[in-house]
Each structure stands twice: as structure tokens, then as C-alpha cells.
Curated annotation (Swiss-Prot):
GO terms for molecular function: DNA binding. Keywords: Activator, ADP-ribosylation, DNA-binding, Early protein, Host cytoplasm, Host nucleus, Phosphoprotein, Transcription, Transcription regulation, Virion, Virion tegument. It comes from the Viruses. The gene is ICP4. It comes from Human herpesvirus 1 (strain 17) (HHV-1). This is Major viral transcription factor ICP4.
């Protein structure tokens, strides 16, 4: 097949891919520059030349040993004289046909090409240093072509130069067990095809030239020298340069030059950078890893939560612009000289600027890479454009061929290879380094599509499928990136008439909220800047002036540097605290923290003199640069924690970089910083202090890992930091790495449990922290020393301990399991044994954040008390000094007997405020009648402000808080509506539900279990029955969740967005405002049962109104501002729009709403001026509920025909805050089952307008255009008591179940 595609170089044919480039080693195969040939039989630019799939082709072309050849035989034994004669004739023909490049005109070699085969290092090191191309030697080394096995006698790993090369003593090489095990991991089976033959090149770099010459000579003729007499019948070698053995001594001396050494190192680095190779350049076989396919992965929830920690717009780590005068070419960090001003580049640039189409051969000299990327990306999304065929085989002109050849000539490569790393697969796609430097992940679409287009492994139909897959995958990414980086979604009111702007704004909330650079790559870059910050000169430009400077000025500078150093310590504490909070307070889970050690700062080169730089702690300019970078890292970590990006791959890299930055600053400033007598306020701050004291963090992390909660970890931090005050450093010099004389972890025999005064009532989950201070050589203590040491190092009291044997105190904190059977699972024994003392409960709950009536709910939940204690600062030193020694029965904590506080002040952080916000829904727990339990989606939060996991991701399979509130408000919930949490800019208003006694309780709320059990016992004490509606799935139910007694009414149901026909059947546009009703789904069916139970249990109370539009108001971004409450009443709307109702209304944000053809409802919400003036801004249309059977739902909309579907398609229920839900029975075809006419909207218009314009999902429709439409009277609520017996099958039967 290869013979059918033979073409001479430089003559592009109709079957060629990118324009060809002359290549000596591929003269007879029609080289295409980077090795990209035709799909029928050419080479694949991305394939592995040593891959097993290519061995057949290699054997057919003579590039690999034939089947049955012993791999252990010598090359001379396996090659016959006839084959050698044929080889010699081929070499002679190649010598005649290949033009020899002019050495003087050749530019210096650029390390942009990384070869996978043995021809990667075709030049001698001395020739590299002298600028000689030595083409003859390169031709002689062409014997092992790409894809060939390495010589069995060649070494696969470099050896020391002094060791002589091994010589083969026998005709056959018999591998032994020792040689096999020591042969650098190379095997003779499947890994042989993955081993790299370029390991010989490393031996060239190590100086074994004699062995190289002998090995190269064996490739042509048997023996150590190519000058040996030829055997009978053997063709003499063609005339050419002298044998390699004669030319070896001359370049040997020049190989020691710095240029040759630098080139050798660069080539070794270039070979090691090839994908799939280790540090020495050998291929490494990837080991398969076990992959867990859980329910989250199969349902898509895992991929919906995927984060990588990187932010669009920030450079990829290691990527950057090329040096001046050069352009990106090759691998990461490689470049070539630019061609600006060359006639080929200028002519191609003019054609590119005038065409308006992507260039078939693109080079950086043509202009901005963003333009070419944008054109290719838009081309890929153009139907019937044959984008894949264009990427594989574009039509080129002679100017394109000239440009490609000029770029290849200037790169400095002598010949081409399909395994070179070029940064792009196709000629038309710009170098990937420009996308990496710009942080544009969407630009990867062009490279992925080009890789598919150039592949030989897919046919046309398969490539079309892959292109569709890429389009669907990249579309949301491109929407977010373009909106965030071009500002299309950041200007409210600008371009509001464009229907695409709204979609872009909804698609990019997370991207717009994060400035470029505040991601994982930004933190890595900050670490690089911090490490490279130069030291300031001692006296500026004049050393004499610095020597004779005034003493007061010097003291002032040192004082200023000291203040900046203290701020650096505070910033380091902030970094570790941000990391700890990002990993839920578990310091042991922070990557890189367990092995953190203070690092010595980089010292300036050269001998120290009178003008040497000042020490780091006195270098104020350098400290200010460090402080700036440390604060940047701290802010970036906080943003990553809020987005939920710390527990992903990029977040781990960012965490390691942040820890390294802290270690670098600690090593420079630790010896000179003054000691703070105060105890650390958190475990993270204690970790920073230990680093600055050159102490190991392992005892602290071990104590934190074994502690039951974060409060015990902080206690361990205090224990680790307390002995530090009385210790002296051995020397004021910089901190040394923990090699020989570093501190060792304390012995575990001495612990607080052995000290007098401790008893069995110690905190049960965690061992007591060590009482001996960590030191290199602990001295024997006096008899009274154990008690004093235990009193000095005793940690702050923990919040939770074991329940006392004599029984818990009624005012203590412990789980009150309701008596008798329960609807939900009972908590575990460990949860029932957790106990908090009355005094600790009183201190922890005494905060304005917790309303007084709701504090008993915290008393019912020890886990909540432990969470509060973890956020409290340590006790004051005065309180600790006043503490007595022993424990007592009532207060097992040593600090309680002296009258001091057990815990320091509570730090009410944002997450804690959000978790405690539920306590303000209903002021008095006695007024709670209905409790709705729900599990929010990641990012949903009833308190507003966004949860710590970042913005929520829309899910059609699982409902959360958004769907729950939409059902209670009798409205639809979609990703583009105000009901979706991703569009909220503030906390939704649910006060109308609270006024009815309905409490919404999340599984993430503080004291979730204690609150449910407290409300149940409170209702039982008042001889009342509580109504509990549980929408939490079994897989989301928390461990040791609340126990709901069977004395109360309990109703379990599901929360499904797919009950909305717009979500379940998006193609059925006539059913967009229809919702499927069921007694098992949170909606009208469940509400009817709850309302009936409420009327039965509380006959004197006002009736519940659960499915009403006035129950919930949202705060979203509208044309009136970023924080507008909707639905807005008509009066509020008229007051808000009044300032714009003048002659300059066209310039205001209400232009589109006041236009004659403006849609009345956008995404079922009031939008036009007429609709907003009538119902209010954002007032939603009410859906029509249809109770269909299971079979009808499974059948889909195709089989749902008849009057009911026509009614749902034409019905238009105007917004009404007090209207009940409209429910239709799906199987009722009798008379009177449907209203006489579908409800609609009548407009009082002088222009004769009668239709309502609806815009949703990119389409516009008009309903109610016929005359005579009138809004029918409201229908009464359907009697649900017996409506669901047939459908539910007794699902809610049982004691205490509605």
C-alpha cells in the first residue's frame, strides 16, 4: 500500500495532508514534513514507532527483524552478506540523491525535536560544538530505521565513563538472571517494543565514544572497525568520509567544551520529555489501575461535580511566551528563530489577513494565534463544512509550501521524523503553547479534532461521530471561556436584546467570579516568583554610602524589616488556615504538610564581602516581595476553597506549592523572629509556628489525626506549642534540614494517660497528647516533674467525651433518642455515648449567632457542639494559669475548677453562619408544625451567598433546594429561571412558609439530627404531633441521622426535576408548562396529604397553603440591579421603572422590555413592560399538573393524545400569588373533567393585541391570539384523599404514616 502513495518531496498531490517538506531519510516515501502522510498508507504523526501494531509494517519495510529471528543473536549473525550488499547499495543511492546542506548556512540546532528512534542524536558532540553538521555520519547511522529493535548487545542504561564497555565473548548472547534483572527494567517480551533505542544516545553523552563507534560499525559490518576487509561477495563500502574509528580522536577533545556539554544536557532533557519516557529517555510501560465505577459515576453526578483547580485565563505551569526574536516551536519551552520580514512569511500573512478563512499552513509570523484558533473552532461547529477533511488534507498553494519549508529550515533540524514533538498535529493548528500560555482550554478543541482527523485508525463515519462528540463536550466550555474572557456576560443591560447573551451569562457565573491567575497555576507561579526574588544589595549602588550610613537609619530599616517579617508570619498562618479549612480542618489531609521542613533560602553566589546582601530577615525589599506573594497565595487558596477546587488534582498541586512557599519563608525568617508568648489560635497557626521554629509537624498531625474532631486537634496544637517557650535554639543560624541533628518525634511511652490526675474519663476516641516536650535528647525528670510537665503541656479541654457511668446531666449535650419505634434508623451506639458537659454546653451555645429558643437543639447534638468548639479560640493564658490540677466528677476538664472559661471566643465564619441560618426561619420552636427535610445539591444554600463547593450544577436526575422551593411556590424550575440556585444573588425569602409553621431543614445544617429530635420531643411534651416530610434519598441520609418517632406523622417522598415535562421531554414544546403529579413526588399530591393532616391535627390553626406563588421570593440579577427581589409586585415595579419613563428610555436598561415586539414572558417569567406592570417583574406563569399513570409516563408524549394534551398546550395560567394548583386527572375523559375552555390571558390593548408572546429555550411563540379569550374562574382544590389509592398501591399505609 505504501508503494501506491509514493511521491517525490516538494510536490503536493491530491492525497497529501499538510504540505510536504524535503526529508532525506524518507526520500522514497513522500515525506510530509512532520511525518503526516495520507490516510491510506502513510505514517501517523502521533503513533509510537515502537508500538506492537506497527511491527508488521516495520518488518515489511525492513525496519525490524523478521518473525522467528532470535532477539539474542548478534547483529552480525543475523545479517547475511546478500543483505549487507543490498544495504550498501541503498546507502549509496541515498548519498547521491540527498542534497547536503551547507554547514555555514545552517542555523544552530534547536532542541525542539524529540526523536523516538535511534536517529535522534545523529551528530557528534564535538561537531555540535563546532557547528559542523557531519552529514556523512548521520547517513551511516541510518541503519536502524524507526521501529527497529535495539541491538541486543547494546546497553540500555548509561554507565560511568571510567568503566570499559562489555565485549561479547561468544557468538550467542545468553542472558542470565542477573543480567536480566539489572538491565534497567527492559524485558524481552511486550516491553521490548516499548523500550527506547535512544538510550544509546545517553551513552554518547556520557563520553563512551569508542563503544559507540564500535557499535555503529557493527551496524554496517561485522567487527569493531568498518575498515575491516570485506568478505567474498560483499560490495565494498561507497566512497565517503573516513571511518568513524579514525575520526573519533579529533572530536573527542572538542567534546569537553561548554557548548558541547550544554547541547548534550539539552538533548538528554529533550529526549526525556517525550511522553511515556522516564528521566533517562527509556519508555515506561503504564501500569493499569483499578477504577471504581460507583453510582455517582454511572449516574453522571461524579462528572457533574468534576473540578480540576485551574482557572481559564491563567498560564499553564511552565508555559510562557517565547524569548524575544523567537516563536514557539516544539515541546514545552522550546522555540525557533522568527521569520519576520522573510518574503514567504510576509506573503502568507497578507493572504491570511485578506482571506477571512483559517490558514492552511499557519505560523506565528502570520499574526495572533487567537484569530486562527477562533476561525478553526467556528469552522468545526459549521455544518457541512468538511472540517475534518480540511484538517487532514487542506488545499495548499505554493506560498504555503514555501512557508512550511522556510519554517523547517530555520528550526535547525537536519531531517524530519514523524516522532518529533512539534506542538501541533496539523499544519493549520497553531502551536499548543499559545493556548497554554493564554490559559484557553477551549482552544484544545482544534488540537483534539486535528488528532482525530489525522489518525489512520478511524474511517469517515467514525471521525464524524467523534467530531460530534467533541462539539457537544466543548460547547459549554467555549461558552464559559468566551463569556468570561471577553466580558460578554459582565455588562447588564448591554446587548440585552441579544438572546445569546442571557445564555452566556448563565453559562459563566463561576468563570466571571474568579479573576485570572487565582487558581492552581497562579499559585505555582507565585511560588516561582517567591523563590526567585533577588536579595537587595547592602548599600544600593554605593557601598561606601552604605558603610558610612547613619546608625539611626540602619536601625529604622531593621525595624521596618522586622515588622514586615511579622506580617509574613501572619500571612503564612493564613495560608495554612485556608488549607486546613479547605480540607475540613484535617491538617493531616493537606498534601505536602506532613513532610514540610523549613528550607534554606537561596544564597547569592560569590564570596561574601563588605557589600554582601543583608540577611533575609533584614532585607526589607525582599521581604515586601515575599509578603506580596504570600498574600496572593492566601487569597487564591481562599477562592479555591470557596469554589471547591482544593480536593482535586490541581488543588493538590496548589496545596503543595503553598506549603513549599511557607517552608521557604520559615527557613529564612524563623531563626530571627521573636517568640510570641501567646498560644496559637488554631492548629494551622500552631503548624506555622512549628515550621518557623524548625520543629517537625508529625506529632501535631498525628495528634490531629487521632482526635475525634478539630477541637482536639487544636488542643494538640497547644500541647505542641507550649513547651517551645522555654527552649533555646542551638544556634541563631538558618534552619537545617532534618538530616542528622533534627528533632525527633517524642517517645510514646510518656503520655498524659500515665501522668497522675488522669483517669478513665479521658476523651475516648483519642489518646492523650504527649507530656514530654519534643526534643533530640529528653533528660530524666525529677519525681515531681511528671505532674508539672503534664500541667504545663495539658491541652485545651475537648468538647465531647464519653457519657458518665452515673448517667448524663439533663443540661449536658447528648443525643435524646425518642422512646419507642421510629420511622427512621436509630443512631449508632457511639453517637449515643458522646457527651458534652453542662458547662461546655453553656459556653459553646452562648453566642448571638444562636437564638436562645433554639439553643436546646444544639444541646441535643454533640456533633454540632464539637463543630462549634473547633471554631473557638484557645483559652486565655490567665485562665490556664488559674486552673487546678485534678479532675472532678462534675467537670472532667482541668480548667473548670478555677473559674476560667473552657473555650476562647467563637469565630463566626461564613460557613458557620450559613449552617446556623435555619434557626431564624421561625422564632419560636413551639410554632413549628411541619418540618421538611431536604438534601441540597452542592452549591445550593438557603442562606444565600453560595456554599463552599462553588456554584451548583444543574441536574435533571436529582432535585435539591431549588426544586423544593419551586414546588412550594407553584412554579417551574429550570437552569435559566429565577428558581434555580445558580442564578441567586442573595438568600431567598421563605418567611411566608415560616409564618405557616413550615420549617425547612437541610442535612448540611448545624445540629440537623438534634433539631429534628428536639422538635419531636417538644411536640410530644405539648401533646402535639409533628408532621415530618422527608425528601432525602436513602443514599444521602447522614450517618447517625435523626430518629423520628412513630408518634408523629411521617411522609417520605422524592424530589425529581424530571416531573417537569420540559425536563423529561424537552422536544414536546407544547408541554413545557405541564408538570406530572404523583403521590410519591414532592408536589401537589404530597401537599394535599400534608394539608389534610394539618387540618386534622391542628383544627384551630389557619389552613396550610403550601403550593402558592407567594410562598417564596428570590433575589436575582435583573435589569434593575444585581440584587433584585422577584417576583416584584406591580407597585414595586412601577416605582422602580418610573425614572426610566422619559425621552431617554431608549438608552436605559428597559429598552428591550418596552419594545413593541418584546416577549411578555421569558422562561415563563414576566418580562415585557406590559406584563410587569400587570403582574410584577419576574412573576411566573403557573404550571398545569397532570396526574398520569405509570404506564402513560413510560409511554412518553407520543401516546399522550386527546383533549388533555390540547388543553395543556393552550392553557396559560396567569401569575397569581394566592391561586391553588390546577390539577387534571390523566385518565378522566368524562364530561366536566376539563374546563370548557383553556385558561388564557386577555389583554386590554388599544392596538387590538390579543396574543401573549412567550420566549423559552431559544424559541418564541404566541398563544391566545384568537378572539374572545377570557381568564376562567379559579378551580377548587382536587380532593386528594382517595385520588391516589389506585396509583400508589398503599405506599403510605401504616401507623403514623399519612
Amino acid at each position: 500500500m505504501a508503494s501506491e502513495n509514493k511521491q517525490r518531496p516538494g510536490s503536493p498531490g491530491p492525497t497529501d495532508g499538510p504540505p510536504p517538506t524535503p526529508s532525506p531519510d524518507r526520500d522514497e516515501r513522500g515525506a510530509l514534513g512532520w511525518g503526516a502522510e495520507t490516510e491510506e498508507g502513510g505514517d501517523d504523526p502521533d503513533h509510537d514507532p515502537d508500538h506492537p501494531h506497527d511491527l508488521d509494517d516495520a518488518r515489511r519495510d525492513g525496519r525490524a527483524p523478521a518473525a522467528g529471528t532470535d532477539a539474542g543473536e548478534d547483529a552480525g549473525d543475523a545479517v547475511s552478506p546478500r543483505q549487507l550488499a543490498l544495504l550498501a547499495s541503498m546507502v549509496e543511492e541515498a548519498v547521491r540523491t540527498i542534497p547536503t546542506p551547507d554547514p555555514a548556512a545552517s542555523p544552530p540546532r534547536t532542541p525542539a525535536f524529540r526523536a523516538d528512534d535511534d536517529d535522534g542524536d545523529e551528530y557528534d558532540d564535538a561537531a555540535d560544538a563546532a557547528g559542523d553538521r557531519a552529514p556523512a555520519r548521520g547517513r551511516e547511522r541510518e541503519a536502524p530505521l524507526r521501529g527497529a529493535y535495539p541491538d541486543p548487545t547494546d546497553r540500555l542504561s548509561p554507565r560511568p565513563p571510567a568503566q570499559p564497555p562489555r565485549r561479547r565473548r561468544h557468538g550467542r548472547w545468553r542472558p542470565s538472571a542477573s543480567s536480566t534483572s539489572s538491565d534497567s527494567g527492559s524485558s524481552s517480551s511486550s516491553s521490548a517494543s516499548s523500550s527506547s533505542s535512544s538510550s544509546d544516545e545517553d551513552e554518547d553523552d556520557d563520553g563512551n565514544d569508542a563503544a559507540d563507534h564500535a557499535r555503529e560499525a557493527r551496524a554496517v559490518g561485522r567487527g569493531p572497525s568498518s575498515a575491516a576487509p570485506a568478505a567474498p561477495g560483499r560490495t565494498p563500502p561507497p566512497p565517503g568520509p573516513p571511518p568513524l574509528s579514525e575520526a573519533a580522536p579529533k572530536p573527542r577533545a572538542a567534546a569537553r567544551t561548554p557548548a558541547a556539554s550544554a547541547g548534550r544536557i539539552e538533548r538528554r532533557r529533550a529526549r526525556a520529555a517525550v511522553a511515556g519516557r522516564d528521566a533517562t529517555g527509556r519508555f515506561t510501560a503504564g501500569q493499569p489501575r483499578r477504577v471504581e465505577l460507583d453510582a455517582d459515576a454511572t449516574s453522571g453526578a461524579f462528572y457533574a461535580r468534576y473540578r480540576d483547580g485551574y482557572v481559564s485565563g491563567e498560564p499553564w505551569p511552565g508555559a510562557g511566551p517565547p524569548p524575544p526574536g523567537r516563536v514557539l516551536y516544539g515541546g514545552l519551552g522550546d522555540s525557533r528563530p522568527g521569520l519576520w520580514g522573510a518574503p514567504e512569511a510576509e506573503e502568507a500573512r497578507r493572504r491570511f489577513e485578506a482571506s477571512g478563512a483559517p490558514a492552511a499552513v499557519w505560523a506565528p509570523e502570520l499574526g495572533d494565534a487567537a484569530q486562527q484558533y477562533a476561525l478553526i473552532t467556528r469552522l468545526l461547529y459549521t455544518p457541512d463544512a468538511e472540517a475534518m477533511g480540511w484538517l487532514q488534507n487542506p488545499r495548499v498553494v505554493p506560498g504555503d509550501v514555501a512557508l512550511d519549508q522556510a519554517c523547517f529550515r530555520i528550526s535547525g533540524a537536519a531531517r524530519n521524523s514523524s516522532s518529533f514533538i512539534t506542538g501541533s498535529v496539523a499544519r493549520a493548528v497553531p502551536h499548543l503553547g499559545y493556548a497554554m500560555a493564554a490559559g484557553r482550554f477551549g482552544w484544545g478543541l482544534a488540537h483534539a479534532a486535528a488528532a482525530v482527523a489525522m489518525s489512520r485508525r478511524y474511517d469517515r463515519a467514525q471521525k464524524g461521530f467523534l467530531l460530534t462528540s467533541l462539539r457537544r463536550a466543548y460547547a459549554p466550555l467555549l461558552a464559559r471561556e468566551n463569556a468570561a474572557l471577553t466580558g460578554a456576560a459582565g455588562s447588564p443591560g448591554a446587548g440585552a436584546d441579544d438572546e445569546g447573551v442571557a445564555a452566556v451569562a448563565a453559562a459563566a457565573p463561576g468563570e466571571r467570579a474568579v479573576p485570572a491567575g487565582y487558581g492552581a497555576a497562579g499559585i505555582l507561579a507565585a511560588l516561582g516568583r517567591l523563590s526567585a526574588a533577588p536579595a537587595s544589595p547592602a548599600g544600593g549602588d554605593d557601598p561606601d554610602a552604605a558603610r558610612h550610613a547613619d546608625a539611626d537609619d540602619d536601625a529604622g530599616r531593621r525595624a521596618q524589616a522586622g515588622r514586615v517579617a511579622v506580617e509574613c508570619l501572619a500571612a503564612c498562618r493564613g495560608i495554612l488556615e485556608a488549607l486546613a479549612e479547605g480540607f475540613d480542618g484535617d491538617l493531616a489531609a493537606v498534601p505536602g504538610l506532613a513532610g514540610a521542613r523549613p528550607a534554606s533560602p537561596p544564597r547569592p553566589e560569590g564570596p561574601a564581602g563588605p557589600a554582601s546582601p543583608p540577611p533575609p530577615h533584614a532585607d526589607a525589599p525582599r521581604l515586601r516581595a515575599w509578603l506580596r506573594e504570600l498574600r496572593f497565595v492566601r487569597d487564591a487558596l481562599v477562592l479555591m476553597r470557596l469554589r471547591g477546587d482544593l480536593r482535586v488534582a490541581g488543588g493538590s498541586e496548589a496545596a503543595v506549592a503553598a506549603v513549599r512557599a511557607v517552608s521557604l519563608v520559615a527557613g529564612a525568617l524563623g531563626p530571627a523572629l521573636p517568640r510570641d508568648p501567646r498560644l496559637p489560635s488554631s492548629a494551622a497557626a500552631a503548624a506555622a509556628d512549628l515550621l518557623f521554629d524548625n520543629q517537625s509537624l508529625r506529632p501535631l498531625l498525628a495528634a490531629a489525626a487521632s482526635a475525634p474532631d478539630a477541637a482536639d486537634a487544636l488542643a494538640a496544637a497547644a500541647a505542641s506549642a507550649a513547651p517551645r517557650e522555654g527552649r533555646k535554639r542551638k544556634s541563631p543560624g538558618p534552619a537545617r534540614p532534618p538530616g542528622g541533628g533534627g528533632p525527633r518525634p517524642p517517645k510514646t511511652k510518656k503520655s498524659g494517660a500515665d501522668a497522675p490526675g488522669s483517669d478513665a474519663r479521658a476523651p475516648l476516641p483519642a489518646p492523650a497528647p504527649p507530656s514530654t516536650p519534643p526534643g533530640p535528647e529528653p533528660a530524666p525528670a525529677q519525681p515531681a516533674a511528671p505532674r508539672a510537665a503534664a500541667a504545663q503541656a495539658r491541652p485545651r479541654p475537648v468538647a465531647v467525651s464519653r457519657r458518665p457511668a452515673e448517667g448524663p446531666d439533663p443540661l449536658g449535650g447528648w443525643r435524646r433518642q425518642p422512646p419507642g419505634p421510629s420511622h427512621t434508623a436509630a443512631p449508632a451506639a457511639a453517637a449515643l455515648e458522646a457527651y458534652c458537659s453542662p458547662r461546655a454546653v453553656a459556653e459553646l451555645t452562648d453566642h448571638p449567632l444562636f437564638p436562645v429558643p433554639w439553643r436546646p437543639a444544639l444541646m441535643f447534638d454533640p456533633r454540632a457542639l464539637a463543630s462549634i468548639a473547633a471554631r473557638c479560640a484557645g483559652p486565655a493564658p490567665a485562665a490556664q494559669a488559674a486552673c487546678g490540677g485534678g479532675d472532678d466528677d462534675d467537670n472532667p476538664h482541668p480548667h473548670g475548677a478555677a473559674g476560667g472559661r473552657l473555650f476562647g471566643p467563637l469565630r463566626a465564619s461564613g460557613p458557620l453562619r450559613r449552617m446556623a441560618a435555619w434557626m431564624r426561619q421561625i422564632p419560636d420552636p413551639e410554632d413549628v408544625r411541619v418540618v421538611v427535610l431536604y438534601s441540597p445539591l452542592p452549591g445550593e444554600d438557603l442562606a444565600g451567598g453560595g456554599a463552599s463547593g462553588g456554584p451548583p450544577e444543574w441536574s435533571a436526575e436529582r432535585g435539591g433546594l431549588s426544586c423544593l422551593l419551586a414546588a412550594l411556590a407553584n412554579r417551574l424550575c429550570g437552569p435559566d429561571t429565577a428558581a434555580w440556585a445558580g442564578n441567586w444573588t442573595g438568600a431567598p425569602d421563605v418567611s411566608a412558609l415560616g409564618a405557616q409553621g413550615v420549617l425547612l431543614l437541610s442535612t448540611r445544617d448545624l445540629a440537623f439530627a438534634g433539631a429534628v429530635e428536639f422538635l419531636g420531643l417538644l411536640a410530644s411534651a405539648g401533646d402535639r404531633r409533628l408532621i415530618v416530610v422527608n425528601t432525602v434519598r436513602a443514599c444521602d441520609w447522614p450517618a447517625d441521622g435523626p430518629a423520628v418517632s412513630r408518634q408523629h406523622a411521617y411522609l417520605a417522598c422524592e424530589l425529581l426535576p424530571a416531573v417537569q415535562c420540559a425536563v423529561r421531554w424537552p422536544a414536546a414544546r407544547d408541554l413545557r408548562r405541564t408538570v406530572l403529579a404523583s403521590g410519591r413526588v414532592f408536589g401537589p399530591g404530597v401537599f394535599a396529604r400534608v394539608e389534610a393532616a394539618h387540618a386534622r391535627l391542628y383544627p384551630d390553626a389557619p389552613p396550610l397553603r403550601l403550593c402558592r406563588g407567594g410562598n417564596v421570593r428570590y433575589r436575582v440579577r435583573t435589569r434593575f440591579g444585581p440584587d433584585t427581589p422577584v417576583p416584584m409586585s406591580p407597585r414595586e415595579y412601577r416605582r422602580a421603572v418610573l425614572p426610566a419613563l422619559d425621552g431617554r428610555a431608549a438608552a436605559s436598561g428597559t429598552t428591550d422590555a418596552m419594545a413593541p415586539g418584546a416577549p411578555d414572558f421569558c422562561e415563563e417569567e414576566a418580562h415585557s413592560h406590559a406584563a410587569c406592570a400587570r403582574w410584577g417583574l419576574g412573576a411566573p406563569l403557573r404550571p398545569v399538573y397532570v396526574a398520569l399513570g405509570r404506564e402513560a409516563v413510560r409511554a412518553g408524549p407520543a401516546r399522550w393524545r386527546g383533549p388533555r394534551r390540547d388543553f395543556c398546550a393552550r392553557a396559560l395560567l396567569e401569575p397569581d400569588d394566592d391561586a391553588p394548583p390546577l390539577v387534571l386527572r390523566g385518565d378522566d375523559d368524562g364530561p366536566g373533567a376539563l374546563p370548557p375552555a383553556p385558561p388564557g390571558i386577555r389583554w386590554a390593548s388599544a392596538t387590538g393585541r390579543s396574543g401573549t408572546v412567550l420566549a423559552a429555550a431559544g424559541a418564541v411563540e404566541v398563544l391566545g391570539a384568537e378572539a374572545g379569550l377570557a381568564t376562567p374562574p379559579r378551580r377548587e382544590v382536587v380532593d386528594w384523599e382517595g385520588a391516589w389509592d389506585e396509583d400508589d398501591g398503599g405506599a403510605f399505609e401504616g401507623d403514623g404514616v399519612l
